[in-house]
Amino acid sequence: LVALSPYLRGGLSFVAHATPTGASLTVQEAANSNSSGQVNTPASLPWPYLRTNIYGINADKSAYMADGILINYSDNFSNGIDDMDALKSYNTSENLSVKSNNILLAVERRHTIINTDTIFLNLTGVKIQSYRFEVIATSLYHPGLTGFLEDAYLNTSTPLNIAGTTFITFTVVKVPASHSATRFRTGFMGQ
């Protein structure tokens, strides 16, 4: 994520999505900027988050980042779909999204984690090859809380480091359940 600027510099773009109540967007010529310098400044996220990236593994063992999602947690957020969530925009190959209330999201802002939370991942466009999830948890740790990634195809559950990064490698093969969009989900449990 980047710090927001009131200006849209040449060569940049953005996506706008109207909420059900409707909205309008007007870009005035005065919003153009001829200034130079750094366009985007990385910003730290003010809320606990779970970021999940997926990397494709090439035959030569090199990797490419294919897609990713972000989930922010706060008592101020709702688990319902609202204008704080970002819809998934599809690309031409692998697509990773969160499926929440039958809506596919790239960014979801959810209420603070409870012991029974489940994040349903939606993974499409995969190829017959190996992949690696990078699951980055920041400020999620609470005594007794554990996280895991479930693989419905292999019927496995891999523990997540809820105070750091976890890497999980998996392979897609020529079996329908192996490339099912609903193969993976992230869950939490507490004591």
PLM regions and their residue ranges:
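Compositionally biased Ser/Thr/Gly- and acidic/asparagine-rich
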Residues: 1-191
